Amino acid sequence: MQVLTKRYPKNCLLKVMDRYSAVVRNMEQVVMIPSLLRDVELSGSGGSVQDGAPDLYTYFTMLKSICVEVDHGLLPREEWQAKVAGNEGSEAENEAAETEEAEEDRLSEELDLEAQFHLHFSSLHHILTHLTQKAQEVTQKYQEMTGQVL
């Protein structure tokens, strides 16, 4: 596993982001054959995935995708929306979404910006910590599957 070289305070978001990136890079180095992760559940006895539950491969690709954005910044809004929507959706849906977003923007300006910042900051910290744990679990599960457990 890669060692963090920068020193940040314990609960600093930059430290959480660096740790997440390091754990995902380690996961990418350990998982040599990602296709082995298909149809394997994250928790449990290593059985096949139940209906609707994400498999290890889904986690693997999601964690890598998020890491790219953490390391290199956000995609432009249009690209992100196209990626999420899978390039499917009508113009009417897009216009409705833009109208709803404009209303949300107006309301958000009226709210306390410091409170919004704190909410989003703490949520991001929590989510990145959770994703880091998931990346460690995917790595550990892959090592168990391939007999690489140290």
Swiss-Prot record:
The keyword Translocase does not apply. Residues 83-105 are annotated as: Disordered. GO terms for cellular component: cytosol; nucleus. Induction: The mRNA levels in rat liver are up-regulated in response to thyroid hormone (T3) and a carbohydrate-rich diet. Up-regulated in liver at the time of weaning, when pups switch from a high-fat milk diet to having to synthesize their own fatty acids. Down-regulated by fasting. Levels of mRNA increase within 20 minutes of T3 administration. Highly expressed in liver, lactating mammary gland, epididymal, retroperitoneal and brown fat. Mainly expressed in tissues that synthesize triglycerides. Pfam families: Spot_14 (PF07084). GO terms for biological process: lipid metabolic process; regulation of lipid biosynthetic process; regulation of triglyceride biosynthetic process; response to bacterium. The modification Phosphoserine is found at S90. Keywords: Cytoplasm, Lipid biosynthesis, Lipid metabolism, Nucleus, Phosphoprotein, Transcription, Transcription regulation. Residues 90-105 have a biased composition (Acidic residues). Plays a role in the regulation of lipogenesis, especially in lactating mammary gland. Important for the biosynthesis of triglycerides with medium-length fatty acid chains. May modulate lipogenesis by interacting with MID1IP1 and preventing its interaction with ACACA. May function as transcriptional coactivator. May modulate the transcription factor activity of THRB. Belongs to the SPOT14 family. Homodimer. Heterodimer with MID1IP1. Interacts with THRB and PLAGL1. This is Thyroid hormone-inducible hepatic protein. The gene is Thrsp.
